[in-house]
């Protein structure tokens, strides 16, 4: 499916928002991809995840891992389509961990799947967990790459939508300077910006 058609689906389901947002990364932006709004529709979830699964189908993936919360639905569906187990990593005391009885085996080929990549911080943390377990990162897949490909996390990396979306460090955000009210819709609790 072409990027323009995929963006139409995001707009139609109100998953692409315009305004002033504090992103999970801490940066500010004038747009926000709320992937949950599009992924709540099974037909869109299947279409989006099939693009990721198809890209990695011949990569010998044994397991799909996703950072909680946003990546779980996407990772689970990609894993289902690839016919492999799916697990997730989550934050405990501010650090990404593998819990709930999940584990990775030495030399296991692991695909890291996320909903949205802005700076790649959460994905990089999950990749470090995979490598610390002695497993191998088979690639990184995501629904939306907000960096338009400038954030490279793995040799094999794929995004369904790749766009350059404006974002700024909080201290130099033009929307804050103009007094535009800010929202923090991400999955991690975000505190209001002092300049908001």
UniProtKB/Swiss-Prot annotation:
<dbReference type="InterPro" id="IPR006273">
    <property type="entry name" value="Orotate_PRibTrfase_bac"/>
</dbReference>
<feature type="binding site">
    <location>
        <begin position="114"/>
        <end position="122"/>
    </location>
    <ligand>
        <name>5-phospho-alpha-D-ribose 1-diphosphate</name>
    </ligand>
</feature>
<feature type="binding site">
    <location>
        <position position="146"/>
    </location>
    <ligand>
        <name>orotate</name>
    </ligand>
</feature>
<dbReference type="GO" id="GO:0019856">
    <property type="term" value="P:pyrimidine nucleobase biosynthetic process"/>
</dbReference>
<dbReference type="InterPro" id="IPR000836">
    <property type="entry name" value="PRibTrfase_dom"/>
</dbReference>
<comment type="function">
    <text>Catalyzes the transfer of a ribosyl phosphate group from 5-phosphoribose 1-diphosphate to orotate, leading to the formation of orotidine monophosphate (OMP).</text>
</comment>
<dbReference type="GO" id="GO:0044205">
    <property type="term" value="P:'de novo' UMP biosynthetic process"/>
</dbReference>
<keyword id="KW-0808">Transferase</keyword>
<dbReference type="GO" id="GO:0004588">
    <property type="term" value="F:orotate phosphoribosyltransferase activity"/>
</dbReference>
<keyword id="KW-0665">Pyrimidine biosynthesis</keyword>
<protein>
    <recommendedName>
        <fullName>Orotate phosphoribosyltransferase</fullName>
        <ecNumber>2.4.2.10</ecNumber>
    </recommendedName>
</protein>
<keyword id="KW-0460">Magnesium</keyword>
<comment type="pathway">
    <text>Pyrimidine metabolism; UMP biosynthesis via de novo pathway; UMP from orotate: step 1/2.</text>
</comment>
<dbReference type="Pfam" id="PF00156">
    <property type="entry name" value="Pribosyltran"/>
</dbReference>
<keyword id="KW-0328">Glycosyltransferase</keyword>
<dbReference type="InterPro" id="IPR029057">
    <property type="entry name" value="PRTase-like"/>
</dbReference>
<dbReference type="GO" id="GO:0000287">
    <property type="term" value="F:magnesium ion binding"/>
</dbReference>
<dbReference type="InterPro" id="IPR023031">
    <property type="entry name" value="OPRT"/>
</dbReference>
<comment type="subunit">
    <text>Homodimer.</text>
</comment>
<feature type="binding site">
    <location>
        <position position="118"/>
    </location>
    <ligand>
        <name>orotate</name>
    </ligand>
</feature>
<comment type="similarity">
    <text>Belongs to the purine/pyrimidine phosphoribosyltransferase family. PyrE subfamily.</text>
</comment>
């Amino acid at each position: 499916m072409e990027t323009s058609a995929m963006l139409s689906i995001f707009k139609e389901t109100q998953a692409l928002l315009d305004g002033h947002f504090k992103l999970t990364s801490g940066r500010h932006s004038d747009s926000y991809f709320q992937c949950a709004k599009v992924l709540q529709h099974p037909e869109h979830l299947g279409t989006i995840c099939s693009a990721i699964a198809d890209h990695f189908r011949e990569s010998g993936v044994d397991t799909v891992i996703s950072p909680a919360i946003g990546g779980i639905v996407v990772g689970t569906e990609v894993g289902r389509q690839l016919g492999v187990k799916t697990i997730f990593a989550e934050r405990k005391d501010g650090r990404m961990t593998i819990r709930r009885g999940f584990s990775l085996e030495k030399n296991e080929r692991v695909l890291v799947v996320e909903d949205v990549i802005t700076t790649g911080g959460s994905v990089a943390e999950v990749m470090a967990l995979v490598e610390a377990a002695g497993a191998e990162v088979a690639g990184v897949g995501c629904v939306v790459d907000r960096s338009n490909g400038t954030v490279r996390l793995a040799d094999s990396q794929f995004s369904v939508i790749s766009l350059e979306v404006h974002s700024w460090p909080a201290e130099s955000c033009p929307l804050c300077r103009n007094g535009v009210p800010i929202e923090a819709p991400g999955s991690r609790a975000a505190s209001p910006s002092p300049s908001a």
